[in-house]
Amino acid sequence: MRIALGIEYDGAAYYGWQRQKEVISVQQELEQSLSKIANHTVRVHCAGRTDSGVHSTGQVVHFETEAIRKDVAWTLGVNANLPKDIAVRWVKQVDSSFHARFSATARHYRYIIYNGAFRPGILGTGLSHYHMDLDVQKMHLAGQMLLGEQDFTSFRALHCQASSPVKCIEYLNISQRSQFIIIDIKANAFLHHMVRNIAGSLIEIGCGKQPVDWLKTLLAYKDRSKAAATAKPGGLYLVEVDYPSQYDLPRPPCGPLFLEL
């Protein structure tokens, strides 16, 4: 039997999603909790492996089990055994053809900047702070130059292992709610550090250090060293993963929760 779960986590205390030796990971904590409820060793497959310090409100995983449990066991039961910064949001039994990673058609990331004079004491690990005024309209206009299928070498981490730098951005929107600036970006797939590298360059445009058409120039360079520094991980969230409608997976609000209030 194959089961899918929606997972939310604050990544500040973890060395990323993926299980690693001698350091704590989100995957390790989730598998330990699931194994207690299933009464056997559980290994999960995820939609996207987030880096150290990166969060998620919309991670999707699947696992195999022969254990017959009510849905409440896979939600409340697993949550009772998880640290407070990781939570199961939903559960659904899925067809054996479903794969959390390979069935996904798109991933939606959200980068949140607190644009204020002083860094916040609360939510500090769930935001990126930038003190200079940012022009949201210029940032949004600049972001539209990244839409479609393009070579994103200039926004690719040097150690990225992807076979191709060509990805397709379906949607890129930048909005503001009070002092929060929100960068929403959806693509078929992402290169390592791609969203944070794009965010870093958008910030340079927003504060007036670079012109609105700078991203177009960076795409043409195909050179990571020409773009801005990588934005900090604390502001980044994997908020949603798209799948074919045949799987009929739940679609809760993207979050994070403090933006929904």
Curated annotation (Swiss-Prot):
Protein name per the record:
tRNA pseudouridine synthase A
Which HAMAP family does this chain map to? Answer: TruA
The protein's job, in short, is: Formation of pseudouridine at positions 38, 39 and 40 in the anticodon stem and loop of transfer RNAs.
Show the InterPro entries listed in the entry: PsdUridine_synth_cat_dom_sf, PsdUridine_synth_TruA, PsdUridine_synth_TruA_a/b_dom, PsdUridine_synth_TruA_C, TruA/RsuA/RluB/E/F_N
Give the Gene Ontology MF terms in alphabetical order: RNA binding; tRNA pseudouridine(38-40) synthase activity
Q: Which residues form the active site?
A: D51
Look up keyword Isomerase and say if it applies.
yes
Outline the subunit composition.
Homodimer.
Q: Which organism is it from?
A: Psychromonas ingrahamii (strain DSM 17664 / CCUG 51855 / 37)
Please tell me which top-level EC class this enzyme sits in. isomerase
Instruction: Report whether Isomerase shows up as a keyword of the record.
Output: yes
Residues holding substrate: Y109
Which keywords does this Swiss-Prot/TrEMBL entry list?
Answer: Isomerase, tRNA processing
